[in-house]
Amino acid sequence: MSNFAVSLPEVIAVLPAAGIGSRMLADCPKQYLTVGGKTIIEHAIFSLLHHPRIQRVIVVIHPQDTQFSRLSVAQDPRISTVYGGDQRANSVMAGLQLAGQAEWVLVHDAARPCLHLDDLSRLLSITECSQVGGILAAPVRDTMKRAEPGIQAIAHTVDRQDLWHALTPQLFPLELLKLCLSRALREGVAVTDEASALEHCGYHPILVTGRSDNIKVTRPEDLALAEFYLTQRQSLNNDSL
């Protein structure tokens, strides 16, 4: 057993993968598209399982999903599956029900195949100093424009000084995330990521600076970019051997 597992709190990961990814214009959900020799979801799962502090990964799938069980990673004893709901928050809640007595839970997008181990380690380190949790995020570098309501015309430029792109994984105490998600769902709040549920309840999660190449594959052009990042990483790994 690793020193991480002995000295630091147990962390369970939840991977919501019940969406259909209609913006990809593909014949299958985006998480099952192949990039860098593996499906996107396999890359996402392996990036978590390679860290010694991640004890289990709970994959939340669509009730009609027949593809995940065919993947070799589905046979890993550290993998559990559960059916999700029609919204991300419902799917995450379904995953949390299988988390048992874990102290901390980490939620990662199934469509983010390029997570770096050092980013994950930095995020996990906040369990030693925070009771609220935090997220990987990247400072906004582009000039941001707000549009006029209902039309594609610029209303004004948004000050990017304190703007961040929210990424995943996002890490929170299990019971706190359950409480905040339940309240947000009950009150009809739009939960676009787990941090927004905590924000709704008055909490302020930590922003942990992450790499901007931790992209979410959402549109067809993202596949080529993910392929480039993964190929580049593999090349660097081979050069270091």
Swiss-Prot record:
Known NCBIfam families for this protein? ispD
Where does the record place the site Positions MEP for the nucleophilic attack?
R160, K216
Which pathway is recorded for this entry? Isoprenoid biosynthesis; isopentenyl diphosphate biosynthesis via DXP pathway; isopentenyl diphosphate from 1-deoxy-D-xylulose 5-phosphate: step 2/6
SUPFAM superfamilies according to UniProt: Nucleotide-diphospho-sugar transferases
Pfam families listed in its UniProt record? IspD
**Mind telling me which CDD domains this protein's record contains?**
CDP-ME_synthetase (cd02516)
Is Nucleotidyltransferase one of the keywords UniProt gives this record? Answer: yes
The record's InterPro entries line, in alphabetical order, gives: IspD, IspD/TarI, IspD/TarI_cytidylyltransf_bact, ISPD_synthase_CS, Nucleotide-diphossugar_trans
Output the superkingdom of the source species: Bacteria
Report the top EC class in one word.
transferase
Gene (name only): ispD
**EC number(s) per entry:** 2.7.7.60
The reaction(s) catalysed by this protein are: 2-C-methyl-D-erythritol 4-phosphate + CTP + H(+) = 4-CDP-2-C-methyl-D-erythritol + diphosphate
Q: Which GO terms describe its molecular function?
A: 2-C-methyl-D-erythritol 4-phosphate cytidylyltransferase activity
UniProt keyword Transport present:
no
Its biological function?
Catalyzes the formation of 4-diphosphocytidyl-2-C-methyl-D-erythritol from CTP and 2-C-methyl-D-erythritol 4-phosphate (MEP).
- Assembly, per entry: Homodimer.
Keywords carried by this UniProt record: Isoprene biosynthesis, Nucleotidyltransferase, Transferase
* Protein name in UniProt: 2-C-methyl-D-erythritol 4-phosphate cytidylyltransferase
| GO biological process per UniProt | isopentenyl diphosphate biosynthetic process, methylerythritol 4-phosphate pathway
Which family is this protein grouped under? Answer: Belongs to the IspD/TarI cytidylyltransferase family. IspD subfamily.
Could you tell me which PANTHER family the record lists for this protein?
2-C-METHYL-D-ERYTHRITOL 4-PHOSPHATE CYTIDYLYLTRANSFERASE, CHLOROPLASTIC
Task: Cite the position(s) of the site with description Transition state stabilizer.
Answer: R23, K30
